[in-house]
Amino acid sequence: AADAMEMLLLAILGPTLRCEWHLSHAQVAAMTTFVFIGMLLGASIWGAAADKVGRRTVLLVSTALIAYFGLLCSAAPSYAWVVTLRCFVGFNIGGGAQSYTLLTEYLPHRTRVAAIVSNLLSWCAGGIFLVLTAWVIVPTLGWRWLTALAAAPLALVLPLMLLFLPESLRYLLASGREVEAAKVMELMAKENGRPPLPGELVSQQFTDASRRGHVSQLFHSSIRRVTLTLFPIWFTIAFTYYGIILLSSDVTSFKQRCPSDNSPTRDSSIVDTSCCRNLNSQDYKSILLASTGELVILPFNLILLDRIGPCVPAWTTTAFLFLTRGCAAALFNWCYLYTAEVYPTSIRSLGIGLHSAVARVGSMLTPLVAQVLLPQVSVSLAFSTYIGLNLACCCLAISLPVETLGRAMQQSIIVDDSSTSAAASGVDEKKD
């Protein structure tokens, strides 16, 4: 939920800072892009680190740094400082993806899907809370207070993480740390009022440190096709999801746009703020309703958005954004779940981190479509871009070679040819 607040904050800050600091469309888009540059780097680095030093350590450090740089951003004196600090926030949000890794490694396959998908409720709740807070705070106290309040929940939850968040048992076993894993299991049994398990805990699939979290393992022959297929899927889903977030504040305000924004003779070095407009109550209502669309898992075709335009009632646009965002959020959850299940423990964090980094490339490019191409060039061309990429994504998803439903999560890639396929590609049908 806290990560969702930091991400949705971009949709609020863009229009607000454009008016207050007389920013151009390109500068607003650049602010979002630099956040995703930070996330691209952070997802890769934190992902590799989580396979080396542990999921819990990465989550604790990245959470503390998100709160720190988020609070600093509230005191930023200029556009350059905002961009820089939001980039650092983005870098550490890249480490937040490891929460999915830690969660999936504790869940049995029978409840894994339901638990991961229910995470969507927390993400949605964070977004809704931020919009409601912005609705009250921005018109009265300003964006700086909103930025500080968005970072506050992370600072508050950090002590709880220190006290109650355990390290992943699968990670400890894959690292050969059976003694620590046994202590975690004893603590879990005590907290749940159950007797400790008898016998000695032994890992059958130990991975040495030199291979754990190594990029080359993602391209092992048994799993290479999965890796290469997931790259464009992650890119497209992030491109669409964050595009919809940005469109939530852009599409609803077409009628109030400056005519000079679309003028072919306009000097790009001159920022026209004569009709600059901050977000009003109707805009916040639209963004709020679009945010609740993440609760809706319904099939929806983006091409319908291209049919509406600005000459129809505002509720129609909002309804389509509601449905589209619900679908995009559902696909994001599917990506995290499938990626966590298809990779073995020895490279699971790296896999999620690297694919999340590829997704940030999509997130980084989508502002150029949602905040530049759409308002300044062509609405049809912008939505055609989203439609084409999603059609290609559908074809790639159908071609994925491994079904993870009901299969055990693997601990490591076995280098022996006779057992490689069972350990890495999911032939093993043992139950959790």
What are these regions (language model features)?
Residues 1-432:
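Transmembrane-helix signature of 12-pass secondary carriers
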